[in-house]
Amino acid sequence: MDDGVEAKPLCLTREQIDKQVERLSRRPEQRTLPDPFPVCPTVRMSKEQLEQVTKRVFYHYSEKHAEALRLAEERREKECGVASTVLSASDVDDIVKRLYYEGMERVKVGRKEASDRLLFKSTKVLPVISLKRFVNDMYLRGLEREKKKEEKLYEKYILPTEIPNLRISKSQAAESAMRLSRRHE
């Protein structure tokens, strides 16, 4: 595929290299984005205007909130009929100590009642039985239980199948024969 034309290596001049470096290192232009809400255009404000609006809204809210708290306090005092008073530090300490010690006393009483309930011991005296007698009684009761169980099973399943007498009379034999022959008819 050699047409006789030699491929020369690509050589750039110093000016071309500088142009390429400038092109590649240049920052892209800042594009302005279109308004995302064309029906209701965005309001553009300067930084000072934005700060003024923020301060106005914030201070307006703060004043409104403080006024609402003051009115609520007045309404509460009017409804309760008692105005709140500011207590001194020593009064506050006395109240805290009183409440603390009363609470500790309640806790102590509650713990004592709970331990009394938990550690309740019956006053009823239980009879003392020797171990040997106890084991023998349990063993004999078990034997008795097994014997009763055998008797009940015998009465339920074995006894109805036994023939009471090995000899039967002629009338009983005839009756039995009639009964057996009628079943197949």
UniProtKB/Swiss-Prot annotation:
InterPro entries: Unchar_22kDa. This is Uncharacterized 22 kDa protein in aldolase locus. It comes from Trypanosoma brucei brucei.
